[in-house]
Curated annotation (Swiss-Prot):
UniProt record, GO biological process: poly(A)+ mRNA export from nucleus; protein transport; translational termination; tRNA export from nucleus
SMART domains named in the record: DEXDc, HELICc
Gene3D superfamilies given in the database record: P-loop containing nucleotide triphosphate hydrolases
Family designation: Belongs to the DEAD box helicase family. DDX19/DBP5 subfamily.
Organism from which the protein derives: Sclerotinia sclerotiorum (strain ATCC 18683 / 1980 / Ss-1)
EC numbers for this chain: 3.6.4.13
Function of the molecule: ATP-dependent RNA helicase associated with the nuclear pore complex and essential for mRNA export from the nucleus. May participate in a terminal step of mRNA export through the removal of proteins that accompany mRNA through the nucleopore complex. May also be involved in early transcription.
GO CC terms, sorted: cellular bud tip; cytoplasmic stress granule; nuclear membrane; nuclear pore cytoplasmic filaments; nucleus
Top-level taxonomy: Eukaryota, Fungi, Dikarya, Ascomycota, Pezizomycotina
Subunit structure, as described in the record: Associates with the nuclear pore complex.
SUPFAM superfamilies hit by this protein: P-loop containing nucleoside triphosphate hydrolases
Name recorded for this polypeptide: ATP-dependent RNA helicase dbp5
Pfam families according to UniProt: DEAD, Helicase_C
Length: 470
């Protein structure tokens, strides 16, 4: 980590803390998205390389088949191409140019694909899903996409509709809590849902799963690594027989990768090196707050910068999210909050209002850490450093990466600011920085003119579409 004046605070945290960690007393219900180990726009790619590992039944990676420059080279149906161009996709991103020739090949083969946040993973698997559909069976479910949250499922549903807007006869439906009536049947060709709801609908025979062709898991590592979601994904997989299983995520920790390979056997694999996982367009910074209470005071000082574009504040606990939202609202600021205790319809409304700019600041838990794409987001604040599970003992690099990936999407520039206030939070952030080999910029809370200049420079470069390095 480095200060804005290029000095390092590494000496301050080089020695491991000898203080004893106090046992966490957090109530499970207060924490969203904690992991319990189980055992559209024009894309501008950054400087990273995609490693392709082909399964035994695949051909030679050096063949022209495995590298394309245009969507037309892939033989994609004209109606899908029209949808891509309408969404302003000009040419395949790196993940798309490597993945799509393999995804669209016949016979269909499985894939485990990893790429940075905001590089076009969703479009890659949506193109695949649309290309596999048999339109002579318009009321037969043929593709199933699972996501860890209702918000992400709704977003993927929207991407399917957008890319498929010119595909005649396409039907898409969300299978999330509250979206399907008790005795109603789900007859859409493409179903996007959360694992528990989909499992229940298949068990009740509300979904005819007999002719499914494709099963896709978005944010696959997160779902396979959580006890509940992992079990549900396995149950859903056991209920259907498909030709192709696709696992997509920005991260695949080593402890999850073996499970992913079992879930999607004999898969082609696309991976990134660990130090290439962070998006270069996200300028990662941190602030040394005086204490836990002082974090809120720093947050209030940052508010003017947060509303230049729009911002997401990530906290660990639901009550923290609600408390911050209440305080900021009482002080006259227009903010919104969303977490797992909200009813589904209310969560949908809050997120849509944020997308439309009715609130410029959203306070949330890890329920929105993954996959959510709101193009106007120029800043992410880690009010609480992400920790694994429900403990305060081990930092969570993967969640950190997904959180900050809510900005800097599709080649844009964004800012992430992490709050630290004691040895434990310093050490946690330092471990995350070492994990990804990144150098964080320290913002000086004693010189707000300098801090504002640094942050504004990045945010305004993003809004102007320039490729500025802070």
């Amino acid at each position: 980590m480095s200060e804005s004046k290029s000095t390092s605070w590494a000496d301050e945290v080089a020695s491991p803390s000898t203080e004893k960690n106090e046992e966490s007393s957090l109530e499970d219900a207060q924490v969203d998205g904690a992991t319990e180990p189980l055992g559209g726009g024009t894309l501008q790619d950054g400087q990273y390389e995609v490693e392709v590992k082909l399964s035994d039944i695949q051909g030679d990676q050096t063949s022209p088949l495995y590298s394309v420059d245009t969507f037309e080279q892939l033989g994609i149906d004209a109606s899908i191409l029209k949808g891509l161009y309408a969404m302003n996709f000009k040419k395949p991103s790196k993940i798309q140019e490597k993945a799509l020739p393999l995804l669209l090949g016949n016979p269909p083969t499985n894939m485990i694909a990893q790429s940075q946040s905001g590089t076009g993973k969703t479009a890659a698997f949506v193109i695949t899903i649309l290309s596999r559909l048999d339109f002579s069976k318009p009321t037969t479910p043929q593709a199933l996409c699972l996501a860890p949250s209702r918000e992400l499922a709704r977003q993927i549903e929207g991407v399917v509709r957008s890319i498929g807007q010119f595909v005649e006869g396409l039907s898409v439906q969300a299978a999330i809590p509250g979206a399907v009536e008790r005795n109603a049947r789900v007859n859409a060709m493409v179903i996007v849902g959360t694992p528990g709801t989909v499992m229940d609908l298949i068990k009740r025979k509300s979904i005819d799963a007999s002719q499914m062709k494709v099963l896709c898991l978005d944010e696959a590592d997160n779902m396979l690594d959580q006890q509940g979601l992992g079990d549900q994904c396995l149950r859903v997989k056991s209920m259907i027989k498909v030709e192709q299983i696709l696992l997509f995520s920005a991260t695949f920790p080593d402890e999850v990768y073996g499970f992913a390979q079992q879930f999607s056997p004999r898969a082609n694999e696309i991976k990134l090196k660990r130090d290439e996982l962070t998006v270069s367009g996200i300028k990662q910074m941190f602030m040394d707050c005086p204490n836990e209470v002082g974090k809120y005071e720093i947050l209030v000082k940052l508010y003017g910068l947060m509303t230049i574009g729009s911002s997401i504040i990530f906290v660990k606990r639901r009550d923290t999210a609600s408390h911050i939202a209440e305080r900021l609202t009482a002080e006259g600021h227009k903010v919104a909050a969303i977490h797992g205790a909200f009813e589904g319809a209310e969560r949908d409304t809050v997120l849509e209002d944020f997308r439309q700019g009715k609130a410029k600041v959203l306070i949330t838990t890890n329920v929105l850490a993954r996959g959510i794409d709101v193009q106007s987001v120029s800043m992410v604040i880690n009010y609480d450093i992400p920790m694994k599970g429900r403990s305060d003992f081990e930092p969570d690099p993967e969640t950190y990466l997904h959180r900050i990936g809510r900005t800097g999407r599709f080649g844009r520039v964004g800012v992430s600011i992490s709050f630290v206030f004691d040895r434990k939070s310093y050490d946690a952030l330092n471990k995350i920085a070492h994990h990804y080999n990144i150098d964080l910029i320290k913002l000086n809370q004693d010189d707000w003119d300098e801090t504002e200049e640094i942050v504004k420079k990045v945010i305004k470069s993003s809004r102007a579409g320039t490729n500025l390095r802070a």
